[in-house]
């Protein structure tokens, strides 16, 4: 989903927090809904969205098409546009906070953000967050270099596979697909997907495990460089994650998402980001 793959920068938690706390607040208010990529907000006591009438969205700015830095240097993406549309429906303001993905739980629990909205997989995390209803179908997939003879999972035996730290793909390969991962020479993790795909293109690794949207974006950008294996690692759903117990905010967002589907806004946004591999067919909340 988007060019800010630092969604889960592979740095220590203390470093992640220092980075986030040191950056300036980007306020979106009722305007265009896009903050400057030059900085991020300082942590502060943020109430739930429904109570404060403000969405403070934590997102990974290198995760196209859901959240990334546009050509104009402004934050953009499907989920950010969707968050702005929801805020408008509810009469809320919206702030965008580009975060280190490793620090998302600390930032949410501290109140520096009041939701995580950026291609956020809900399966396996239900005990840790209060979620909106799921809105988008997603898959975890494997991407390899084109024309190197890797056509199936079996061909990855003895190969080096890389994924993003604390990603859904890592969870799958360390959980339901751990037997597959055991056949790899190594399963490496890295802070952001842009670098992972650079390593794949250079031959430093043999495959990248990632969200379908990331794969589609990379394949669209470099169709002669990469190929996606046919068999997905898993299927899952995206939802908006709130601090555990913030049911009021989650319900309000779900209500607005359904309304945005009904009035055609969701279809328009899916079409806007179609070139990034996003499909209206994957929308599930109706």
Give the predicted meaning of each segment.
Residues 2-18:
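N-terminal secretory signal peptides and thylakoid transit peptides that target proteins
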Residues 25-40:
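Bacterial lipoprotein signal-peptidase II cleavage site
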Residues 29, 80-89, 159, 165-168, ...:
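Extended ligand-binding regions for polar small-molecule ligands
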Residues 61, 137-144, 216, 220-255, ...:
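Periplasmic-binding protein-like
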Residues 61-64, 75-88, 120, 141-194, ...:
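Bilobed "Venus flytrap"/periplasmic-binding protein-like clamshell domains
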Residues 80, 96-106, 187-198, 236:
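Short helix-initiation/N-cap motifs at beta->coil->alpha
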Residues 84, 93-155:
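Acidic, polar ligand-binding/catalytic clefts
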Residues 103-106, 119-128, 172-175, 201-235:
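A ligand-binding cleft/hinge motif common to bilobed small-molecule-binding domains
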């Amino acid at each position: 989903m988007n060019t800010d793959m630092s969604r889960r920068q592979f740095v220590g938690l203390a470093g992640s927090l220092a980075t986030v706390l040191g950056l300036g607040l980007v306020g979106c208010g009722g305007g265009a809904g896009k903050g400057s990529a030059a900085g991020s907000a300082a942590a502060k006591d943020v109430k739930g969205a429904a109570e404060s009438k403000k969405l403070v969205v934590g997102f990974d700015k290198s995760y196209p098409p859901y959240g990334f830095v546009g050509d104009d240097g402004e934050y953009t993406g499907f989920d950010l546009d969707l968050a702005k549309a929801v805020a408008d429906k509810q009469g809320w303001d919206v702030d965008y906070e580009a975060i280190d993905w490793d620090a998302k739980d600390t930032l949410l629990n501290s109140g520096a953000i009041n939701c995580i909205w950026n291609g956020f997989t809900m399966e396996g995390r239900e005990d840790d967050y209060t979620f909106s209803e799921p809105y988008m179908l997603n898959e975890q997939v494997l991407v390899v270099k084109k024309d190197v003879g890797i056509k199936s999972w079996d061909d990855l035996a003895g190969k080096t596979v890389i994924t993003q730290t604390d990603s859904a793909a890592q969870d799958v390969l360390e959980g339901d697909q751990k037997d597959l991962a055991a056949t790899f020479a190594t399963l490496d993790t890295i802070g952001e997907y842009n670098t992972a795909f650079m390593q794949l293109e250079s031959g430093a690794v043999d495959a990248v495990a990632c969200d379908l949207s990331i794969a589609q974006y990379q394949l669209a950008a470099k169709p002669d460089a990469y190929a996606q294996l046919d068999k997905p690692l898993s299927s899952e759903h995206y939802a908006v994650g709130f601090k555990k117990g913030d049911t009021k905010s989650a319900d309000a967002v779900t209500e607005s998402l359904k309304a945005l589907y009904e009035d055609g806004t969701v279809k328009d946004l899916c079409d806007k980001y179609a070139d990034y591999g996003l499909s209206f067919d994957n929308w599930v909340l109706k």
